[in-house]
Every structure is written in C-alpha cells, then in structure tokens.
Amino acid sequence: MKKRISSIFCLLALAIISIQAKDYNVKDYGAIGDGKTLDHIAINATIDTCVAHGGGRVVLPAGTYLCGSIRMKSNVELHLMTGSKILAAPASMKAYDEAEEFEGTAYQDGGHTYFKNSLIYAIRANDVSITGRGMIDGEGLTR
C-alpha cells in the first residue's frame, strides 16, 4: 500500500513538472536586440511557438528590441528582463499591422479602429500578461 501511494505521488509530481510553463527566449528565434533591427517578427514567431506548445513565457533578455506590432495570444506571458526595452518603430518603417475597417463607433477615428495598428495588442485572448523589470517605450508613437 505504501509503495502504491509513493508511486501515485511520484506520478503526480512528474505531471505537475511537465505542465509547468516553459520559457522561450526571443533570441533563439532570431531577435537581435540592437535597437536598429526590426525584432517584432522574431518576437511574434516566438509567441506562435509558445502557443503551439500550450503557452508559457516569452523572454526578452537585456537589449533594445525595435518593434512594430507584437501580437499577444492566449496563455502567453511576455517577460521583459532587467535591461530589456521594447522600442516602438517609427511609423515611417511601416512595421505595424493594418488598422481595421470601421466596425462601429467605439474606438474609431476616420473609419478605422486601431487595435491591430498598435505596438502590442491581443484580440480574443485570455491569460495574457506582460511582466518583468524591462521597459516599453512607445516613443510618442503617432499614426
């Protein structure tokens, strides 16, 4: 009986360990973090990989990540390590997703809403977070 209980606890411990969220380092997916190279494509690829494996933590180590639209998805924590910065790309770089067509009067300007045309956004997502001691610098981004 004691062996059976011990076996059950071991299996339970292994199950808990296997479902813990995994870290995905954006540099492993091509991000440079030099403040000159557009890194949102690599960050979005990291988020997609994270989601494909059930979610987890997308980690930005120290560096400056020049970015257009970052698309957050369910079960993803975007974690900015100390010394990391997401820096909004200038609008002239055309690195942002297209604004949505008019879908009502809320949050619209000139026939467009601006959820997708943002630095960081999520649509129909849950369990999304941005954590850490890094910085997000919108640079006074305008459309």
Regions found by a protein language model. Name each.
Residues 19-143:
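Extracellular/periplasmic carbohydrate-active domains that bind, remodel
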Residues 1-23:
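Bacterial Sec-dependent N-terminal signal peptides
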